[in-house]
Amino acid sequence: LSINQKSTEKNQKIIRDFLYKQISENKQSNILFDRSVIDNYIYSLALYDKGEASLEFLNETFDLVMRHLDFLDGVILIPTAASIKLVSDNLRDVDVNYIDKINRYFIKTLLLINKTRPLAVFVISVSREERIKLAGDIHRYMNYKMRL
């Protein structure tokens, strides 16, 4: 599937439906997902802004984001390009302007979500080794918080 700037509404729908199904059907605890329907909404919003996705699709995706929150205890945001060296690997986008736009969309969307639905958001912008350690610390914190 084409992703990032090369994605399409059709591809975003396939990805969105897969992500939603993956998290909503998983009954285990203590799981970290590296992508969520929130990610999908952000990339769909970027497509919408370019006129390449419909408002109907965007609204449908946001509705799924809000339902998706029932399955999340928190979100870890790792802004790309802030601490992660951009490498052209044919998977990730390396266009700094696009990445900055995506990072801004994430921040705006997470703030919007938090106005109506409190969600723990952790921003990690450090080296890979430190990200792994901090993710473990966040995991322990979330487990502690759930026991209270």
Residues covered by each model-derived region:
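Exposed alpha-helical structural elements
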Residues: 10, 14, 57-60, 64, ...
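Short low-complexity stretches enriched in small and charged residues
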Residues: 1-2, 30-37
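Residues that form generic nucleotide/phosphate-binding pockets
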Residues: 18, 64, 68, 109, ...
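Conserved substrate/cofactor phosphate-moiety recognition/catalytic segment
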Residues: 1-24
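ATP-dependent NMP and nucleoside kinases share a basic, alpha-helical "lid"
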Residues: 23, 36-105
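Loop/turn-to-beta-strand initiation segments
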Residues: 27-31, 73
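NTP-dependent small-molecule kinase module
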Residues: 91-148
